Regions:
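Intrinsic structural disorder
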Residues: 1, 22-23, 31, 126, ...
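Active-site-proximal beta-strand elements of phosphoester/diester hydrolases
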Residues: 1-7, 176
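A generic secondary-structure micro-motif detector
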Residues: 4, 35-36, 170
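Active-site beta-loop-alpha junctions enriched in small/polar residues
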Residues: 5-7, 62, 104
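CN hydrolase (nitrilase-like) catalytic-core segments centered on the catalytic cysteine
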Residues: 9-99
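Active-site-adjacent "lid"/gating segments
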Residues: 68-71, 75-186
Length: 186
């Protein structure tokens, strides 16, 4: 599914309904000029939309060649999968760039199946979703061994960052403690 620029900035982006209709990869072709701080805002916006829609969200802004004396463009490109940044371009580069990432479509499908609110939203918007045309693609994989662009962590549920790991372990401890306390009070 494709959005154009500020489609993602509105209260109900078209990609939200597209995701409910089955789109798993959303591309935003943007001509959004750059201002101070907009880089971080785009990251937050794209991360949140990919997380809310349980999708891959590819955002690409016009590059420096579009710049004038009044406005500037940075050529920022981002690929997020369910709220996680997979790839990012360099900004303010005059040469053409290509960013590539492995998107785990099966993971996204699994997350959508497991997230009950996603299915509930689908039912709520059933009539609106009928307007979407579904185009299924069969991709033929190249033969031989394929190298992944993304790194798969040895322990994917254990953060490698020491501070984040300590925080996560603290949360696990608090959750288990609360559950045990509730059981003992019953």
């Amino acid at each position: 599914f494709a959005e154009i620029c500020e489609d993602v900035w509105v209260a109900l982006p078209p990609s939200t309904l597209a995701a409910l209709a089955g789109a798993s990869v959303i591309v935003n072709l943007s001509a959004s000029n750059i201002t101070v701080g907009k880089d971080e805002y785009r990251h937050a916006l794209t991360a949140n939309q990919s997380a809310r829609t349980l999708s891959a969200y590819v955002y690409t802004a016009a590059g420096p060649g579009e710049s004038t004396t009044d406005l500037a463009w940075d050529g920022q490109a981002l690929i997020y999968e369910n709220g996680t940044l997979l790839a990012e371009s360099r900004r303010f580069v005059w040469e053409p760039q290509l960013i590539v990432a492995d998107i785990d479509l099966e993971r996204l499908s699994q997350e959508r199946s497991r997230t009950t609110s996603f299915g509930a939203n689908r039912r709520v918007h059933r009539e609106q979703l009928k307007a979407f045309r579904r185009i299924c693609l069969e991709l033929e994989l190249p033969g031989g061994a394929l190298e992944l662009e993304r790194t798969v962590a040895r322990f994917p549920y254990v953060p490698s960052d020491r501070h984040l790991r300590a925080k996560r372990c603290g949360e696990v401890y608090a959750i288990q403690t609360q559950g045990l306390a509730k059981r003992l009070r019953s």
